[in-house]
Amino acid sequence: MGKKLVMAQKRGETRALCLGVAMVMCAVIAYYILGTTMLPLYQKSVWTQKSTCHLIETNIREQEELEGKKVPQYPCLWVNVSAVGRWAVLYHTEDTRDQNHQCSYIPGSLENYQVARADVEKVKAKFHEQQIFYCFSTTRENETTVLYRRLYGPQTLLFSLFWPTFLLTGGLLIIAMVKINQSLSILAAQR
């Protein structure tokens, strides 16, 4: 009976060690993926200064000629604000600025024009309700763009690192508990 118990303990310890090592390896892989995708975006984000923006004007632009380019077939919202003592164009996120420099807000669903138009109207109405709001600006002097919301801020980075850290801690805890259990069983066998 005693030998079967020892063998069962050994098998359980091996499985627990494998689980702990697998958790640590998954955490390392997740850290690598986050380090190569999220971290460069966070470091590249220059909109770090939280400012107060005052709404100047909002326009909904349909298909019209802007700087020699045709705006795509969706309505886009153009928002001008006053931030940090200067005039600026407000963009919803970093990605909005990269997708189309002529739109402050691009609606989520572009398939149905009427739904997109209603979405843009709703956002425009919210800006007119609350004409003073927080935005993110850069410390550069000649920059004339500000962001309403940062995609790659410190909170996003911390939230992304939470689960890999949880996985790493859990894996290390399992490995430590197995090793402590093994050393205690060796001490008990010696007595």
Curated annotation (Swiss-Prot):
GO terms for cellular component: voltage-gated potassium channel complex. It is found in: Membrane. Coiled coil: none annotated. Glycans are attached at N80, N142. The chain crosses the membrane at residues 16-36, 158-178. It comes from the Eukaryota. It is a multi-pass membrane protein. Regulatory subunit of the calcium activated potassium KCNMA1 (maxiK) channel. Modulates the calcium sensitivity and gating kinetics of KCNMA1, thereby contributing to KCNMA1 channel diversity. Increases the apparent Ca(2+)/voltage sensitivity of the KCNMA1 channel. It also modifies KCNMA1 channel kinetics and alters its pharmacological properties. It slows down the activation and the deactivation kinetics of the channel. Acts as a negative regulator of smooth muscle contraction by enhancing the calcium sensitivity to KCNMA1. Interacts with KCNMA1 tetramer. There are probably 4 molecules of KCMNB1 per KCNMA1 tetramer. This is Calcium-activated potassium channel subunit beta-1. It comes from Canis lupus familiaris (Dog). The lineage of its organism: Eukaryota, Metazoa, Chordata, Craniata, Vertebrata. The gene is KCNMB1.
